[in-house]
A protein has these predicted regions:
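TRNA-recognition modules of translation machinery and tRNA-sensing kinases, especially anticodon-binding
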Residues: 1-205
Length: 205
């Protein structure tokens, strides 16, 4: 550490820690939480054309989804979270693909992780906009986050999961880059009610 300052890298950190030292009731699972926050990264040693602009930011906004579930249901929860993130990208009409990370690329804290990448028309390459992970009992063990079985009152570690939904700067850039028309930038249909217009052009006030 270079100093004693701490900024969150993702909302997963404070949201998951809400349940530190908790013994949850089985009937209350799964617990689902969503948080929007600023995220901070040192990105030490990042420089050059491949990490400029939106590729590597020290601060950006992101929506995070978090789940706490029983071990036997955690992979069903993972599938539901994957469907949720994929649904967002479909509604935004963005070209995307999903990667299942191998053991060499996955964080040591996660048991299974999927990355979502959108196509950057300007850079002509795929950029990550979401990671969805099942940590199984790794985080719960450190948090002492447990649940009590309804039948025999046995206490067991929960499983924790989290995902980005989504990293906003790259999503905004992808919307702009992939919706270029001779008339201007087309706004995805799902966003029109929020924007109040269908096209972004030089005629707008």
């Amino acid at each position: 550490n270079l100093d004693d300052l701490y900024l969150i890298p993702t909302a997963e950190v404070p949201v998951t820690n809400i349940f530190r030292d908790e013994i949850l009731n089985e009937q209350d699972l799964p617990i689902k939480r969503c948080a929007y926050s600023a995220c901070f990264r040192r990105e030490a040693g990042s420089y050059g054309k491949d990490v400029r602009g939106l590729n590597r930011l020290h601060q950006f906004d992101k929506v995070e989804i978090v789940r706490i579930d029983k071990p036997e249901h955690s992979y069903q929860s993972l599938d539901e979270m994957l469907d949720h993130v994929e649904g967002l990208l479909k509604k935004l009409e963005l070209p995307y693909h999903i990667l299942r990370l191998c053991g060499g690329d996955i964080s040591f804290t996660a048991a299974l992780c999927y990355d979502f990448e959108v196509w950057s028309a300007a850079q002509e390459r795929w950029l990550e906009v979401s990671s969805v992970s099942n940590f199984e009992s790794y985080q719960a063990n450190r948090l002492h986050c447990r649940y009590r079985h309804a039948d025999d009152k046995k206490i067991e570690l929960c499983h924790t999961l989290n995902g980005s939904a989504l990293a906003l700067p790259r999503i905004v850039a992808a919307i702009i880059e992939n919706n270029q028309t001779p008339e201007g930038i087309r706004v995805p249909k799902v966003l029109v009610p929020y924007c109040g217009f269908e096209m972004l052009d030089d005629k707008m006030d």
